[in-house]
Amino acid sequence: VSISMKSILAAAVASLVVGNAMAADGTINFKGEITAAACSITGGAGTTVGGAAGNQTIDVSLGKISIDSLGGTAGGSIAGGTSLNLNLDCGKTGTGLTTVKLKFDPVSGTGIDSHNESLLKLGKDSTATGVGIGIYGSDGKLLNLSANETINAPLNSNTEKDGEGNDITVYSANLNLRAAYVKSGAAAATAGIANGSLPFTLEYN
């Protein structure tokens, strides 16, 4: 018994030594910048925007869509849907920046659909099944929410007069996207309430 135990101990020590021999130390360096950019959002028809810049809520009405008009599970077609033409007014805070990215955080919202990871999962207050919410870019392509795909737009500059008649440069951007219900999974969809929540962040470069 003692010999067997020594053999096991020796093997364990040898394994530990090899593990240490293969170990290596390193450093991860993080680089970034905190910008002063603070853009307020206004929305187009079908959207209601509330709250102050930096903490705004956008309510979108997707309307009433019949089951037989839902897009397929691949998300290649848009069933009705609502355009979200978001206009960003950044004032003078966009100096030195060229691009704004709309990044989504579905996990902090109602989640990612279990049958199609490109889609937003319906919330717990929903009674419809077999349906998710798709976000489309201006090119009509379905975004993959689980892959952190973004909606990007240039940050445009324009010269205006301030209250004293001096020229100032102000910045704005237009983020054009569309939201729609999409069939999810192989099972037949059922009718009912279909709500979802999708937190977002505006990132500037």
List where the protein language model places each region.
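Mature extracellular/passenger domains of Gram-negative fimbrial/pilin and adhesin proteins
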Residues: 2-6, 19-205
